Amino acid sequence: MTVQDSGKVALVTGASRGIGYGIAEALVARGDRVAITGRGEDALKEAVERLGADRVIAIPGKAHDEAHQAAAVERAMEAFGRVDYLVNNAGTNPVFGPMAELDLNVARKVYETNVISALGFAQQTWKAWQKENGGAIVNIASVAGVAPSPFIGAYGMSKAAMINLTAQLAHEFAPVVRVNAIAPAVVKTKFAEALYEGREAEAAAAYPLGRLGVPEDIGGAAAFLTSAQSDWITGQTLVVDGGIFLNAGVG
């Protein structure tokens, strides 16, 4: 299928698989050119092959590395001449357990990767293109950042911070750049499989829509928040959760 070029360019972090890949796929499908980042060079190469090497480039590196943040934006600018959209999807969640037993060094790692890296990419994109030319930023948060979730407190804490970062950047970058967040519930990815592995039907039964999320669900939301249809939306967190939060008001 031939896709008409939109003339827009997106940088999507953590996009070799899972939610990030789903977002990149949605943006490519509507005609954007996309730069994707990730740690694994082989996985990135495979992602580019699937998405289309004529429209996508890969930039390997660690999200929390400031040099990588700068280099990724620079490489995207060199390849495509602009970076209209930034999607901060890169994240980590290496620990499950109660906060009382949380290793503080692990907590720092989670915060650095999930929050500080998003700020770093936003700063670099702002300086390189968006300050003078406008655009949009989408931060991938989580429902765990909206309400507490058992055993993933470190992750939830970082995602709550990302939601606040979203509002702060929306205020500071207005009126030229819109900044919004997406807060998914459980999405079927390698990243989240510990939350449903071996019990998917049971986990899905808790959702009013009867299933867990898939990366395409988040891709569609990101495509909306980087489109003209959302031109009067900024500083918001779009919860994409299959209705799971509705259960809080039942009974």
State the predicted function of each range.
Residues 142:
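Residue(s) in the substrate-gating loop at a strand-loop-helix junction
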Residues 93-96, 147, 223, 234-251:
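Short C-terminal tail/terminal secondary-structure segment
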